[in-house]
């Protein structure tokens, strides 16, 4: 019995020169990859630093301080009975489309404040809306996971001509037309962006890269249409090549969800707004963040940003009901616009730069000029 027990005891011992398990090999490999990634990150930061020859505030020291703008509230558009979630200007510089938590999409005459069209969508929380370049149709969508396109006409019942052109696997958070009325770009809570053919409803290109919900997209005004930018809950802003479907640049810096993104008029930079109560300016050529627009007294999220026509002014809509006016080059706040009675959800400058429009949870859209 003792001999058998001794053999059993010796056989239960592991050999001293045992080989690493598959799990151990995998852990070592992952650690090696993490170290390589960290080294590459350091090299990338060094290359970015070489391009950052001078801080933007220092470069702007010789510029004169901006004088009084004289911007005031000129129009209030009332008609929604729920939180206004999104708005967009028509390229005719006169009409505005808005979408709301009440399930309504309204097309307004910004001069007269009259409602020209009102549509009831099959879902509440219509989170996105956009005018086509021709101003002859609008796109909208939200919690129904779909993007619908509606031709605008005074002769027919336009809701009968509504057609579905896109379907995501989660809510649609943003949309915009690309170059013409034929292509539409959407962003979704399913972490993807996609380009769709308006006529056929076919998916043309899918963009995978975000690790969280996509909240905002934008296309540069001066570009030929080969890039766009997206941002969202993963705190990253990604620049995409439309032709290849690949992410070509990634920017980080925010400490919370990014709610809004907007290209600078020259197309070489973009601004973001976040739940961390800051706006940030990123330079595509320098491949880095170049400015943070913040104040200790600002504690509320930024839900909408846009530039003036020259790019010198950055408008930002906050959760504290105010519109902040920033000098984008001196990185200093110039003034504040008061009027809304609830958080601002969206903000856009008119195509000719003569006005700014803000949408709010107070059920109104306001035009400032």
Curated annotation (Swiss-Prot):
UniProt organism field: Caenorhabditis elegans
GO terms, biological process: feeding behavior; G protein-coupled acetylcholine receptor signaling pathway; G protein-coupled dopamine receptor signaling pathway; negative regulation of gene expression; regulation of egg-laying behavior; regulation of G protein-coupled receptor signaling pathway; regulation of locomotion; regulation of nematode pharyngeal pumping
Keywords, alphabetical: Repeat, Transducer, WD repeat
This protein's name: Guanine nucleotide-binding protein subunit beta-2
InterPro entries: G-protein_beta_WD-40_rep (IPR020472), Gprotein_B (IPR001632), Guanine_nucleotide-bd_bsu (IPR016346), WD40/YVTN_repeat-like_dom_sf (IPR015943), WD40_repeat_CS (IPR019775), WD40_repeat_dom_sf (IPR036322), WD40_rpt (IPR001680)
Gene symbol of the encoding locus: gpb-2
Gene3D superfamilies: YVTN repeat-like/Quinoprotein amine dehydrogenase (2.130.10.10)
Region feature (Disordered): 1-28
One Gene Ontology term of the molecular function aspect: signaling receptor complex adaptor activity
Biased composition (Polar residues): 1-24
Quaternary structure annotation from Swiss-Prot or TrEMBL: G proteins are composed of 3 units, alpha, beta and gamma. Interacts with G protein gamma subunits gpc-1 and gpc-2 and with egl-10 and eat-16.
């Amino acid at each position: 019995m003792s001999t058998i027990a001794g053999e059993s005891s010796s056989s239960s011992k592991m050999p001293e020169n045992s080989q690493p398990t598959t799990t151990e090999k995998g852990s070592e490999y992952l650690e090696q990859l993490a170290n390589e990634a960290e080294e590459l990150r350091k090299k990338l930061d060094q290359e970015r630093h070489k391009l950052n020859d001078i801080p933007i505030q220092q470069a702007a020291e010789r510029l004169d301080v901006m004088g009084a703008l004289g911007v005031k509230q000129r129009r209030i558009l009332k008609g929604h009975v729920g939180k206004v979630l999104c708005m967009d200007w028509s390229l005719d510089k006169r009409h505005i489309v808005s979408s709301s938590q009440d399930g309504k999409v309204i097309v307004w005459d910004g001069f007269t404040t009259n409602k020209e069209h009102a549509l009831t969508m099959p879902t509440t929380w219509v989170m996105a809306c956009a005018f086509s370049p021709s101003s002859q149709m609008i796109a909208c969508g939200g919690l129904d996971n779909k993007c619908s396109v509606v031709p605008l006409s005074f002769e027919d019942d336009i809701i009968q001509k509504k057609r579905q052109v896109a379907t995501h696997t989660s809510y649609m958070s943003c949309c915009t037309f690309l170059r013409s009325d034929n292509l539409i770009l959407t962003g979704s809570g399913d972490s993807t962006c996609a380009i769709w053919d308006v006529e056929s409803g076919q998916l043309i290109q899918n963009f995978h890269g975000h690790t969280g919900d996509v909240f905002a997209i934008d296309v540069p005004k001066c570009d030929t249409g080969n890039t766009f930018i997206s941002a969202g809950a993963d705190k990253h802003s990604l620049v995409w090549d439309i032709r290849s479907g690949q992410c070509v640049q990634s920017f980080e810096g925010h400490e919370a969800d990014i709610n809004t993104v907007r290209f600078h008029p020259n197309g070489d930079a973009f601004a973001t707004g976040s739940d961390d109560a800051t706006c940030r300016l990123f330079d595509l050529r320098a491949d880095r963040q170049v400015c943070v627009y913040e104040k200790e007294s600002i504690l509320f999220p930024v839900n909408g940003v846009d530039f003036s026509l020259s790019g010198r002014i950055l408008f930002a809509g906050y959760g504290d009901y105010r519109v902040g006016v920033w000098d984008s080059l001196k990185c200093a706040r110039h003034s504040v616009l008061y009027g809304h009675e609830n958080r601002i959800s969206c903000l856009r400058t008119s195509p000719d730069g003569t006005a700014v429009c803000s949408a709010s949870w107070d059920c109104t859209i306001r035009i400032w000029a």
